[in-house]
């Protein structure tokens, strides 16, 4: 019977199972995710070579001018040394994982989850998937509020493959796209996009993309040759007048 159980376990029947239990489901960027991984033995003992936790996010990739959905592994950790789980034994292994500053906020179509995988020799590896609610840092929230107070309306939020000039820093970026509702800005701008490159409690580094509205022949030619988009890299600190600093940066591209 023992040999038969081992054969069944090798194809996933009566094998060990895994369930990751998070201490909470909602986290802020840069916070530490904590919890336990619960492994329950199946009908026979099995050797658990490794337990991996991998942080994933979905994102949009552009291939041949078509947008396709994909997923990116943002971080992975191993939480154990090899051990044997006995039949019907229950074992809990605690873990902690830092959320990197590049993890997207879970708004719009953006999703973030932890995938738990067991590496079991000569067997189908069981797995588990737990979704997270990710909130921006306090300072990032203040930046987004300041942009809206300047007269911009948040139109959409997308997580996309990082452009080539940022791929040495991150695989993906989350773009907050704003449409102007302010009459002063509307004369000069079509839209505004903001990407958070780094976030901490005391500062945020952002990339602002300003899409200028075409004005006259010169503006038409700029737009025709994709020269109408300007980039601003800006670091904002917790003691800054955020709204004034953003306004100065945006208006510098309107002149």
What are these regions (language model features)?
Residues 1-255:
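Terminal, compositionally biased non-globular sequences in eukaryotic proteins
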């Amino acid at each position: 019977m023992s040999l038969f159980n081992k054969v069944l376990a090798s194809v996933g029947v009566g094998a060990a199972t895994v369930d990751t239990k998070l201490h909470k489901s909602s986290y802020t960027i840069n916070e530490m995710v904590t919890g336990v991984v619960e492994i329950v033995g199946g009908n026979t003992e099995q050797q658990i070579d490794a337990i991996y936790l991998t942080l994933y996010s979905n994102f949009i990739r552009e291939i041949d001018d078509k947008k396709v959905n994909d997923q990116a592994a943002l971080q992975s950790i191993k939480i154990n040394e090899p051990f044997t789980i006995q039949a019907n034994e229950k074992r809990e292994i605690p873990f902690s994982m830092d959320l990197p500053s590049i993890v997207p906020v879970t708004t719009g179509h953006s999703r973030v989850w932890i995938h738990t995988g067991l590496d079991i020799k000569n067997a189908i590896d069981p797995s588990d998937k737990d979704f997270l609610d990710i909130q921006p840092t306090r300072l990032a929230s203040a930046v987004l509020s300041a942009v809206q107070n300047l007269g911009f309306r948040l139109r959409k939020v997308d997580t996309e493959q990082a452009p080539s000039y940022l791929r040495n820093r991150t695989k993906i970026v989350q773009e907050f796209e704003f449409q102007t509702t302010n009459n002063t800005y509307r004369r000069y701008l079509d839209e505004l996009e903001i990407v958070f490159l780094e976030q901490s409690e005391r500062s945020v580094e952002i990339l602002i993309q300003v899409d200028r509205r075409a004005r006259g022949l010169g503006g038409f030619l700029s737009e025709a040759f994709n020269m109408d988009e300007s980039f601003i890299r800006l670091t904002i600190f917790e003691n800054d007048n955020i709204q004034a600093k953003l306004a100065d940066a945006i208006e510098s591209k309107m002149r």
